[in-house]
């Protein structure tokens, strides 16, 4: 798993790794790029809140449908970054709560998402067509 977000490093890993060694992106924002370079998948935070769209993006990339993969990735791009405005999994839990999938309430050592990020994440959800 390469979670550096450095496409050059990911490309080098793919070039140097044995053929049977699978390379996964651990960085949502650069996941599509690594897939298109020959990566084998994405270990995704975004998939916790938009699993179908992430799956469709990965399938499109794997099948060579660059147009669809780019459209889907562009819809998810804000989530890829904004889900990290605070320590993971705090923003993810907030989004999933907004989706109505879990009740509110976070246990220590986690703390609630700072209110200053609510509108930012709501906007990212809208761009990804996530229903609340």
Language model features with spans:
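Structured C-terminal cap/extension of enzyme domains
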Residues: 29-132
């Amino acid at each position: 798993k390469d979670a550096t977000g450095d496409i050059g490093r990911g490309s080098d890993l793919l070039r140097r790794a044995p053929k049977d060694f699978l390379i996964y992106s651990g960085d949502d924002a650069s996941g599509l790029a690594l897939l298109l370079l020959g990566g084998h998948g994405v270990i995704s935070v975004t998939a916790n809140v938009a699993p179908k769209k992430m799956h469709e993006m990965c399938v499109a990339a794997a099948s060579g449908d660059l147009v669809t993969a780019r459209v889907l990735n562009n819809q998810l791009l804000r989530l890829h970054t904004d889900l990290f405005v605070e320590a993971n999994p705090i923003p993810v839990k907030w989004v999933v709560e907004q989706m109505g999938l879990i009740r509110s309430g976070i246990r220590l050592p986690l703390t609630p998402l700072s209110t200053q990020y609510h509108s930012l994440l709501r906007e990212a959800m809208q761009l990804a067509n996530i229903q609340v």
